[in-house]
A protein has these predicted regions:
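A generic structural signal for short
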Residues: 12-13, 35-36, 55
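N-terminal glycine-rich anion-binding loops that anchor highly charged ligand groups
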Residues: 16-47
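Active-site-proximal beta-alpha core segment in soluble small-molecule metabolic enzymes
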Residues: 38-120
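Non-membrane alpha-helical structural segments and their capping/turn regions in soluble enzymes
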Residues: 11-14, 18, 108
Length: 120
């Protein structure tokens, strides 16, 4: 899934990124919050590894393609932060058979269609 990075370039100061991650994870205001960072902006396994190294195990992404990309790189608890498309139920189900995949729904009809289709 290299296509996720075709349209952007990034310059990342890894030392600063590590400091920012550590600051959030040690901030007492967030002590009782389950931290699930959104990986839409960086779309980078290298940056994702900074989060993993800091103990983060759950992530949020913006599409099925991004979920597949990060799942293929060892992330196994992923939330897709857009409403699920029932037309992609087969693809969601395949991925959910490999990882802990969470989906959002925005209507009772979508929920019903997904519940009747998804097995995992």
């Amino acid at each position: 899934m290299n296509s996720l990075n075709q349209h952007s370039s990034k310059i990342v100061c890894f030392a600063r990124a590590e400091q920012n991650i550590a600051q959030i994870l040690t901030d007492t205001r967030f002590a009782k919050i389950s931290f699930r960072p959104h990986f839409k902006t960086h779309r980078s396994i290298a940056v994702a590894e900074l989060f993993r190294k800091a103990g983060v195990g759950k992530i949020t992404v913006a599409s099925l393609a991004m979920a597949e990309y990060f799942a293929a790189n060892g992330w196994n608890d992923i939330l897709i932060a857009i409403p699920a498309n029932p037309a992609l139920a087969t693809e969601y189900d395949e991925l959910a058979g490999k990882i802990d995949l969470s989906l959002l729904v925005d209507s009772p009809d979508s929920l019903s269609l997904l519940l009747h289709t998804l097995k995992n």
